[in-house]
Amino acid sequence: MTLHHVRRGTGRPLLLLHGLGGSWRSWSTVLDALAAEREVIAPDLPGFGATPPLAGEVSIATLADAVTAFLDEHGLRGVDAVGSSMGARLVLELARRGVVGAVVSLDPGGFWQGWEQVFFYDTVASSYHLVRALQPVMPALTGTAVGRAALFAQFSARPWAVPADVALTEMRTFAAGPSFIPLLRSLVHGPTQQGAPAGPRGATPGPITIGWGRHDRVCVPRQAARALATFPGARLYWFERSGHFPQWDTPEETVQLVLRSTG
């Protein structure tokens, strides 16, 4: 599977998988720091950024198939992997399948129950349609702290502090991905995430670290316990000052966690 991607740095490879509506640029706040220590491979997942959508079903399973094919194409099977949001669930699925090494899963989606599931779908779908409608004025909105505070209130603990260029890029990509709505529906209404088979470390090839923002308003913190129940060999790390995207709110802490957990 051909995925548009960037490769930076030298050293042991490290795969970065973005979230729903993102692209490789979603890692821009931590990319250079990670590339100073590792060779970073950051693809655009199918239907986002510069990678065309899949021909058929769009789901965690089919995205995992596509990423596995990409890893095989580039000789990267067994690579350490970091994921954010939907990408965080994706790296857990890849670990369950045994195709990646050490994993850092940042605020993974998919561990909601009851009202949380409805809340996730309704708020994210509403954000998508609003962002699409606001595209003509998006440069002005993302160019001010007040505008960023309004746009990113659900996603960041410090939305006004998200860099203006990062905010604009995210809002452009968020609105443009043809796979956004099909994947959102699949995430909410599709199969729940399976855990790893029983065994050492949950029978995954490498250790799993699940990072969660204490102020996550997308995947609320109570969901962390369910993620750990699904992957009982995982270690939980709390970002005390972060929302849904620790790479935005606490980039230095995120880099330290990734390097420490995959080293």
Where are these regions (language model features)?
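Short beta-strand/loop motif that positions the catalytic acidic residue
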Residues: 204, 210-212
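Acidic catalytic loop of the alpha/beta-hydrolase fold
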Residues: 214-219
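Gly/Ala-rich beta-loop-alpha elbow adjacent to hydrolase catalytic centers
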Residues: 83, 87, 91
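Conserved HGGG/HGGXW glycine-rich cap/lid loop of the alpha/beta-hydrolase fold
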Residues: 6-52
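Flexible "cap/lid" loop of the alpha/beta hydrolase fold
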Residues: 96, 100-136
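Conserved acidic catalytic loop of the alpha/beta-hydrolase fold
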Residues: 61-79
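Conserved alpha/beta-hydrolase catalytic His-Asp/Glu region
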Residues: 139-203
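Catalytic histidine-centered segment of alpha/beta-hydrolase-like enzymes
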Residues: 239-255
